[in-house]
Amino acid sequence: MNYTNWLYFPMRLAWRQLIFDRTKLMVAICGVLFACVLVFMQLGFRDALYASATSAPVKLDGDLFLMHKQSEAMWRPIEFKRSELMRALGNPAVADVFPLYLGLAPFKNIETKVKRTLMVYGFDPDSTSFRIEAINNKREALKLKDTVLFDEYSRPEFGPIGQLIAANQNWTEIKDYKVAIIGLFRMGVSFAADGNVVTSDINFMRIFPKRSLDNIDVGIIKLTPGSSQTSVKGELEKLLD
């Protein structure tokens, strides 16, 4: 009881001070609420940035990844020689390596004909370069000329691709080159591009005729079971240019 009496007076005094000027109280409360909103907005922006930056890398099926040392980001890579990736096979802990090609290109909406930029991924269909079942199940089909897979998590401005495929209206243009969309997969957009397309390395070269199979953007490296990623990474850094 004594404790309650001791606590009652300071609480009552504090409350009186708060409500003495109700206008200032409301302004202070609004200020605190606005600050909280800003904090949560910043957290949301941070999470969105992280999710968009990692949407593609986490879907690649590899233990280590090789890029040019001057590349600023995965979506802005600098090409390097495919032979440099092949040199990684000289390390006994490296089980296999696969090249990956990337390029930004305009995609024509099948219905509106409006073009919007997306990211095109080219890979060897004989390899399992992605941790995406929908892509791995279509590897044989991607060996056919002018075939691509479309990311259904792309922005809606690209059109209702799933419905158009079902209606056999699956032909469009990427970088003014005619291609057939033969299926869908799920990856996610990034700040670099509003959508994604995956195709074979040969079809990639048809879309980007100035590119060469000898110059790659990302090297996917798979290690033997039980190998230390940290140790192999250090060894490859010394071996490769």
Annotate each PLM feature.
Residues 60-62, 93, 114-119, 144-146, ...:
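Envelope-exposed proteins and targeting segments
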Residues 34, 45-82:
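Membrane-interface junction motifs in transport/secretion proteins
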Residues 125-133, 150-167, 207:
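Short, solvent-exposed hinge/capping segments at secondary-structure junctions
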Residues 154, 173-241:
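Mechanotransmission and gating elements of multispan inner-membrane complexes involved in transport
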Residues 74-79, 110, 114-117, 128-132, ...:
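Solvent-exposed, non-transmembrane alpha-helical starts
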Residues 82-86, 90-91, 95-149, 175, ...:
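The feature marks short, hydrophobic/small-residue-biased sequence motifs that occur predominantly
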Residues 160-180:
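Short conserved beta-strand and strand-loop elements enriched in small hydrophobics
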Residues 1-39, 49-50, 55:
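N-terminal Sec/SRP start-transfer signal
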